[in-house]
Amino acid sequence: MLEFLQQTTIPYQAIILALSGGVYAFEQYLNVRQLPHLKLKVPPPSIAPYLVTADGPKPEIKEKPADQGDEDTGEPASPQETFMKSQAYALDKVKFAMIAGFIDQIETWALLSPFAAVFFGSDPTKPASGIASLWALAIHLSHRWALVAPKLLKIGTGEIATSLFFVTLLSLTGMITSVPSSLYKTFVLEEKHGFNKQTLGLWISDYIKTTLLSALLGLPLIAVFLWTVRWAGEAFVQYVMMLLMGIVLFMYVGYPYLIAPLFNKFRHLSEFPEYQEVKTRTEALAKRINFPLGRLWVIDGSKRSAHSNAFFFGLPGFTKHIVLYDTLLKQSTPAEVEAVLAHELGHWKLNHTVMLLGSSQVQIALTLSTFRFFLWNGALFYSFGVPALGGGSEMGTRYPLIIGFLLAQSLFTPLNSLLSFTSNALSRTLEFQADQFAADLGGDYAKDLKWALVRISAENKATTSCDWLYSAFHHSHPTLPERLARLGIESDKNKKLK
């Protein structure tokens, strides 16, 4: 098997470009399937009942109709207006995704094909690619840096040092398209639909912080990762998995305390007199289900967006802390917030966090195990014009591991797309279970959760009209009609409408 895969006659470059194009075409096909659903002017019969507020508080979205922008009129939107708002928002997002996907695909082809290499003076008669040219530039920069850098900042000129320069160059080329795309999405698309709360100064500040954090944390981790793989050889999977698990556990604990405060302000819920009923209800709920509640935090999500959210964090077996977005508190009643938290804590009670972590680790382990067939495959590197590092090993000629992982990942892009269906299916199943957990608590939990979902969906202009295949690929959460139907609300709603 290995001997067959290492034949230089295998056109790996053409295969990967074809696979990349196939995945792109499939994703665009899904977008095209979704478009007719977003152009409906009247809610489909299966959705219409959920937009009629027969027995609960109506989601008050004080906005003009979809063709008049998002300024406050002082009047609550009708269910029809709410539906049209969500349709307009979803349609704009899909159109944006189609354009952004096309640009990303051009960037991918430029890196993987010989096209960009001609600008670096590559020999047109030999295999070449954009990544091979970037690697050659990274070698040059690492040697230049070794000559001019202060002693404390010298990192050598070996594979790891060159790989760090390569990753930096790759990130910089990505910024050419990602920065304009992010600016458009934030200040045009989100602004148009009333969600953006950021100023340009805040966006720039966030971008600088994110870039610096990525460099300060990401580059050392990449160095450790590459060293581990090179040190462990063919047995690298188990050691890399231990490294990744350590990173995941650190993020569980460190992100809320070390990273998130750089972007958002956390305040104790007790500091808000108007939300003391939420505090009382949450503490009672936690006590009822034996949730190890630590602190209740409020995060200033409204600083950047009108979207709402709630989550908890903490290592398995230890105290957990709950975080509520201020937008959720402003948009929902105390009973609805409690119902939302009952759903979130249901994930903890049903061990969903551990299940998702375990499934992701299994998926990563299987992927890395498959990568072993290609990390030292000279034919793969040759096809893209990537030279050997020189020297040898028991596995053969040494090639840049960072490029090996990049190319192996490109080979398995279709598989990753298929796994999106399975991972989303698992996630949606767990969401249904968490909804049912909240409903099974009795009392008004089912009704309050229903109206919380309706209100949050309306406030966030969530898509309620979806193509089934598009939804299966893109949505980790069930749609609003699906969740309400599973909660057993549909029959009750129909009775009240008669």
Where are the regions that the model predicts?
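Short, contiguous hydrophobic alpha-helices characteristic of membrane insertion segments
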Residues: 401-412
